[in-house]
Amino acid sequence: MRFTIIMFVVITLVVAAVPNIVFVVSRSVAWLRGRQLGYGWFGYATLAMTALWVMMFVYGMVWGRFECKVARVTYRNEAIPAAFEGYTIVQISDLHLDGWRGHEELLKERVATINGIDADLICFTGDLVSLSRAELHGFEEILGGLKAKDGVVAVMGNHDYLPYDGLPPLRSPRSKAKEIEILQRDITDRLGWRLLLNENVIIRRGNDSIAVIGCENQSMGVHSVIRRGNLKKAATGTEGMFRILLTHDPTHWRGEVLGKTDIHLTLSGHTHGMQVKLFGLSPGPLIYSEYEGLYSEGGQSLYVNIGLGATMPMRIGATPEITVMRLIRF
């Protein structure tokens, strides 16, 4: 809640400042030309923009972040083994459990929706928590209820390494490492998920098989503070197979996967779709080459899920997402 209040105040101040900055620049230009420029409409613009932002924020906080869409995607590739024709993967990402406190029943509904899909595999692509491993407490039974034929596989996101925890007080590196270790153990033992830490799991159907590779967070862009991925280690033993990579940050795809490996499909999250999309427009492309949906290049593909949760608890237009991906051979 403290983080929410701080961010709300900061953004409100920025929004209110925009017309005033324009006014100062305009007045300076007018002064240089020997003219006078009154405050006039700039004052009204300040009030209007601030009021609009507050209304949008309230909408995004009260309603927007609790909406949900099921995005159905067909992924086609001739390399998919015959036995995996029609294989269904549900991808979820970026739960940020601190934002679900007090809304447990709604999260149960999301789990019920996912279970109703009757997927072959559920993939979670990171950011279970926002600040602390303690956020998981009370959600174990709910998230442990996720069911798929081949179970739930997961990777860590940048927030799951708790880099934003402890200000103040600062945690010692040893204490932080212990907290991360406990969170990883809780994901495995309390949720029953298969957590892939630079490793892989082979899924078999008769004589056919596919590899699901899980890489620890390897950010190559604006959030490059967490770089623990070891793709070579994670992919060991999967050579020549149809391969699906789970990696939290989509910048990893262009940084180390695309054109550098023969990994067919990568699933990522992290961007939240920037949590804002108005009239089909998002600030995402200003920061990320790939920020939402399916991308294909040179026979390799990336899907970016925009998450079910939020860091700042509001979403405007960027509706929380459950992805249902069906594998089809050409």
Language-model segments: residues:
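Non-catalytic terminal accessory segments
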Residues: 1-66
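Beta-strand secondary-structure signal
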Residues: 21, 72-74, 324
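Short, charge-rich amphipathic segments
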Residues: 34-50, 74-81, 110-122, 254
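Hydrophobic alpha-helical transmembrane segments in integral membrane proteins
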Residues: 55-79, 99-101, 105
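Soluble catalytic domains of enzymes that build or remodel membrane lipids, polysaccharides, and related
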Residues: 83-330
